[in-house]
Amino acid sequence: SGVAFQLPKLLGGKNVSPSEIENNIKTSPFIKEAIVIGDDRKFLSALIGIEYDIVSNWALRKNIAHTTYRNLSENEEVQNLIWEEIQKANEYTSSLQIRKFRMLTKELDHEDGDLTATQKAKRNVIMDKFSDLIEEMYK
């Protein structure tokens, strides 16, 4: 997950480690997973996985009905909450702003091949599996 990628259109070819940006985003208690996309793209985007129990408790306090990870992550108010959290992370990386994001509609799972044995996201697997979501951000 820490493999550096090039952001030539953003930074004049400077290599940036996506894990730095991802870790910054994951300081939010609401965000469990952040996969930053930027290789050969005009701007940075991210796939976000929520911290289900914490977001679920937040949603219950806001009277947001939900029964599954999917319908919680698809809820507009939850997406607004996550965007606010991304904006907070963006304040710390002024030249590397996440401009768009999409919510993962299921938790990443080691058994599905999404995570390593140490529970780290497998970037290439996730980028292949969620390529439709990624392409949607760059249309």
Predicted regions and their residues:
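AMP-binding/adenylate-forming catalytic core of the ANL superfamily
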Residues: S1-L96, E107-D112
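Short capping micro-motif at the N-terminus of alpha-helices
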Residues: P18, R123-N124
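A short N-terminal helical cap/helix-turn-helix that marks the beginning
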Residues: N90, F130-K139
